[in-house]
């Protein structure tokens, strides 16, 4: 799993809107930081939406829609930077999205515990076993491009379709050859603002 992406996911989803609210009996709903972080990560990396939906107070269908909408926006943003190649078809966008999901599924992590401080903020400990899938993508892209040129294709004049083919093949090579590094432990600070809304701390975004 790419650490940078993981923190981006947490930053995006933890700031969605989880506000401590009053229960019917007049008490406060206890924020379960460990369950929520695990739910966020499982929804994004494993397409498991039950714990995330429960924490958000929404249906699993709506939880899935939220995550997929976020991924659709990611795909559109990334491909919009390649306008010079021409337009990507909806089928090509979906194929790229499917490959991103495959890469996400390689993520290995375990949410260990959440410790609350006196101010009601949390430090969540996560064990991460990093994948090298993104680290090998550049080398695999070079290899695939060479294979295409050996077949007579001029990759220097690639349009959207040819680039898509190169990209998908490269991603698949990285997935097929994926290996993992040593397990490391990271800590994510989940803090509460003046409105009672939780979010990831700015320091964890550095």
Whereabouts are the PLM-identified features?
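Bacterial N-terminal signal peptides that target proteins for export
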Residues: 2-13
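Enrichment for repetitive, rod-forming helical segments
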Residues: 14-15, 196
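C-terminal motif of bacterial Sec signal peptides marking the signal peptidase cleavage site
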Residues: 21-24
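Subset-of-secretome marker
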Residues: 28-206
